[in-house]
Amino acid sequence: MGLATALRPRDSRAVPRAALVQLRLAKEDFAFAAAHFTLFPDAAAERLHGHNYRVRVELSGAELDALGFLVPVAPVKARVRAICATLDERILIPEKSRLLELRQEPDAVQVSLGGRAYRFPKSEVSLLPLPNVTIEALAQYVWGELAPSLAASPVRRLRVEVEETSGQSAAFEADLTS
């Protein structure tokens, strides 16, 4: 008997049709250190400050391959690390904010809010397609960056959690199928 045969369930009725296998990945290097300020409706904002963010992902699906895997994890881990690298040691600026005035120069990004003005080196800024840099928005952003790499896989549902401090995190979870 081959390995693939040995790993198959003996009776397909043993696994309910609606059952999902969940694969959770939370590696030490699923992390990024970044600065931001949160904007508030009254045109106020926090001071510029930083966090050491941590990212966790959960993949859910019903079908395992012949060796009992939901999906090869190495490419998923590599993609999460790559997403984190684009945010690491950067100033996160929400480019879709109606509260900020942004001006891009060849070598700098200028940001104004009320009486505050910043000029950052362009290489140290990540302009994010978000209205605000919150952990909720970051979780949704990371989900959106990771999801396309899973489109051809048997993963049905993806959950991304972003933690900004111990005990304070947000998650975004959605189906991968339309």
Explain the meaning of each model-derived region:
Residues 3-178:
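Charge-rich, low-complexity N-terminal segments
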